[in-house]
Amino acid sequence: MTVGWVMLALAALAAGDEASLRRLELTNLHGGEKLTVTFHNEHDIAPDALGALRHLLRDYRVNKEHAMDFGLFVQLTDLARQCGVPASYEVISGYRSPATNAKLRAAGHAVAERSQHMEGRAIDVRLKGCPLPRLRDLALAAGRGGVGFYPRSHFVHVDTGRVRSWQE
């Protein structure tokens, strides 16, 4: 009888582990690179997966990588779950170097002088299968950081900075 309960407990633990598993698929639209990573939390993701994420989200204009806030990846998987679709994102922008940020500002693009992109704390994305206004609403409701809505450019900005919002 005890063995039966132990087996049931192990099965429940295994199911719980499976339920907490996060899968994130990113496609960088500047070059078409694609990456899929699976993790439970920041402590169990493989170091080479973190390196691959850093590379995929690099500033493609100057080919410079930067560490990304792991909270972004958790936030992206949570948003996809709430939208009821797989976490399959198209990435418009991840890390942005200070030099690139300054060039974009000088060219008249609407980028913040102290952009969270320069800190590796922001990402501009589209979530496949989730309407853009719904993705924005879910990100706003989560209250985990900044949310920018760019309907003309067709993306949502999410970051792990202070809670705030804006629109194109």
Enumerate the language-model features and the residues they cover.
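N-terminal export leaders
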Residues: 1-3
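Bacterial Sec-dependent signal peptides at the C-terminal "C-region" and cleavage site
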Residues: 8-20
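Near-N-terminal "mature-domain entry" segment
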Residues: 17-48
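Catalytic cores and adjacent binding grooves of peptidoglycan-active enzymes
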Residues: 22-27, 110-168
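Short, surface-exposed glycine/acidic/tryptophan-bearing loops
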Residues: 40-41, 47-48, 95-122
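Active-site acidic/histidine clusters and adjacent loop/turn architecture
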Residues: 41-90
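Sec/Tat-exported extracytoplasmic proteins
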Residues: 76-83, 87, 99, 129, ...
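A structural signal for short, well-ordered beta-strand segments and their strand-loop junctions
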Residues: 88-92, 148-149
